[in-house]
């Protein structure tokens, strides 16, 4: 989940 959230922040 953390990786997906980071991608969305980009």
Swiss-Prot record:
Biological processes annotated in GO: neuropeptide signaling pathway
Major location category of this protein: secreted
A GO cellular-component term linked to this record: extracellular region
Subcellular location: Secreted
UniProt entry tagged with the keyword Transcription regulation: no
Keyword line: Amidation, Neuropeptide, Secreted
Location of Phenylalanine amide modifications: 10
Family: Belongs to the FARP (FMRFamide related peptide) family.
Protein name (record): CalliFMRFamide-12
């Amino acid at each position: 989940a953390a990786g997906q959230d980071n991608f969305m922040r980009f």
